[in-house]
């Protein structure tokens, strides 16, 4: 009995010493925790053998301890194999455990750290590329300025385009090179009519010169145009009225933001520009809304600045996503008294409890308006409001402002509608396929029920 008790005490003390040794080594180095854990589990029975060698007094007791620890190591190895069988689920779309990397072997963890270092270097190169790309954008923005300035002058009736500048071929008038060569070969002289049918058909008499006839009609209408010329000059508006208001209202994401009381102010827009940050400054772009002098606010320029993420965070460089917007800031609008469309003023009458005197108190409450877009309070990427604001700023910079005439004329809307129609057709097609599959499944179920009924009849 005494000998068995001594053997039990020796085995317990050896296991305790081995566990303490593992804990000390684990606190020493973070990356060697996997080795210590593996040694603690005793995959090869090494912990038991080291503990038995440390005792060195009773070989048989040491062998028993080593054997016991070896069995524990086998059990631990079995549990590791079971957990490894479950790990691939995380790679198929399931949420990975936070200690997934910690559970990997030490050599594998070293390789993962090497890959992370490579990823950091790649992100540094990407950030450098984006900064240089921003410089190229700035260079071409200067080349665009003459075109954008002429657009502003035409919209605001500062410049009247010539007839040559107004010549624009629509899609129906476009022709390819083969058709142009065909016209050059067969001639296209004024007053000359081409005969595209055989002479024996007798249809030549029906062809006449439309150009000559139009000239005759124009001569007959010269008197009418001369009499109404003065009235037309008075009726013709200057420039393109409500250009920017129409553009903004034709944008799906902006339409819900524009209220009736915003439209009179947006009619005063003379131009919307995109200004990129100067060299050496943090990457950003500013949307500039230029207004005519008006009765609503004293500002003639309202701005919204979007700061881009162009550098890696020292504490965590891996979530880098390119030129994502970090935050945005608006400007302070100097509203004239009683003209602030972003606030709703309510007057209340209050009666004094003791004296009975009545006083009028006014309270301001925020209300929906397009001009909340210029809120001076910074908006970060946290939250849904930030994502919506960043998407709107990106669309204004990239699509709406450079292609404003397409949104004014509705050409951009047609492309948007085509995309919507395509999505609807795809949804309808998917619904038809789904219905067909469900009908086939119901038929299979009915056949199964019939087979079950036949089997029951046979059994009877």
From Swiss-Prot:
Main location: nucleus
GO molecular function: chromatin binding; histone acetyltransferase regulator activity; histone binding
Cited function: Acidic protein which may be involved in interactions with other proteins or DNA.
Compartments in which it is found: Nucleus
Segments of skewed composition (Basic and acidic residues): 1-11, 27-36
GO CC term, one of those recorded: nucleus
GO biological process, one term: positive regulation of neuron differentiation
Gene3D superfamilies according to UniProt: 1.20.5.1500, Nucleosome assembly protein
Residue ranges of the TM segments: none
Biased composition annotated in UniProt, kind: Acidic residues: 214-236
Family classification: Belongs to the nucleosome assembly protein (NAP) family.
Pfam families hit by this protein: NAP (PF00956)
Keyword Nucleotide-binding tagged: no
UniProt protein name: Nucleosome assembly protein 1-like 2
Motif (Nuclear localization signal) on chain: 346-352
Name of the gene encoding the protein in the UniProt record: NAP1L2
Keyword annotations of the record: Nucleus
Matches recorded under InterPro entries: NAP-like_sf, NAP_family
Region (Disordered): 1-88, 214-238
């Amino acid at each position: 009995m005494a000998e068995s008790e001594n053997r039990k005490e020796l085995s317990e003390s050896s296991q305790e010493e081995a566990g303490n040794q593992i804990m000390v080594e684990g606190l020493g180095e973070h990356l060697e925790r996997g080795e210590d854990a593996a040694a603690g589990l005793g995959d090869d029975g090494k912990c038991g053998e080291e503990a038995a060698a440390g005792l060195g007094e009773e070989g048989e007791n040491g062998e028993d301890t080593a054997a016991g620890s070896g069995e524990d190591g086998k059990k631990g190895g079995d549990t590791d194999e079971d957990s490894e069988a479950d790990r691939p689920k995380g790679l198929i779309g399931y949420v990975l455990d936070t200690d997934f990397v910690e559970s990997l072997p030490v050599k594998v963890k070293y390789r993962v750290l090497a890959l992370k270092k490579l990823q950091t270097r790649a992100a540094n190169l990407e950030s450098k590329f984006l900064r240089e790309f921003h410089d190229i954008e700035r260079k071409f923005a200067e080349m665009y300025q003459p075109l954008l300035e002429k657009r502003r002058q035409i919209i605001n009736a500062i410049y009247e385009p010539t007839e040559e500048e107004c010549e624009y071929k629509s899609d129906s008038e476009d022709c390819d090179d083969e058709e142009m060569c065909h016209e050059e070969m067969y001639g296209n002289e004024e007053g000359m009519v081409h005969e595209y049918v055989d002479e024996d058909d007798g249809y030549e008499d029906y062809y006449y010169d439309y150009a000559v006839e139009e000239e005759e009609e124009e001569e007959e209408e010269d008197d009418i145009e001369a009499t109404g010329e003065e009235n037309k000059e008075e009726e013709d508006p200057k420039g393109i009225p409500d250009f920017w208001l129409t553009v903004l209202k034709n944008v799906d994401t902006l339409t819900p933001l524009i209220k009736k009381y915003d439209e009179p102010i947006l009619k005063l827009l003379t131009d919307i520009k995109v200004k990129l940050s100067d060299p050496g400054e943090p990457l950003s772009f500013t949307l500039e809304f230029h207004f005519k002098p008006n009765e609503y606010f004293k500002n003639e320029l309202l701005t919204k600045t979007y700061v881009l993420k162009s550098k890696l965070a020292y504490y965590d460089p891996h979530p880098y996503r390119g030129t994502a917007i970090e935050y945005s800031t608006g400007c302070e609008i100097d509203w004239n008294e009683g003209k602030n469309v972003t606030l709703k003023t309510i007057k209340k009458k209050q009666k004094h409890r003791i004296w009975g005197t009545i006083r009028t108190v006014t309270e301001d409450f925020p209300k929906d308006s397009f001009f909340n877009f210029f809120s001076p309070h910074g908006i970060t990427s946290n939250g849904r409001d930030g994502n919506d604001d960043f998407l709107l700023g990106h669309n204004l910079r990239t699509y709406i402002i450079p292609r404003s005439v397409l949104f004014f004329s509705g050409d951009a809307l047609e492309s948007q509608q085509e995309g919507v129609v395509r999505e609807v057709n795809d949804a309808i097609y998917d619904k038809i396929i789904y219905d067909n599959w469900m009908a086939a499944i119901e038929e299979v179920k009915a056949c199964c029920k019939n087979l079950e009924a036949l089997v029951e009849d046979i059994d009877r």
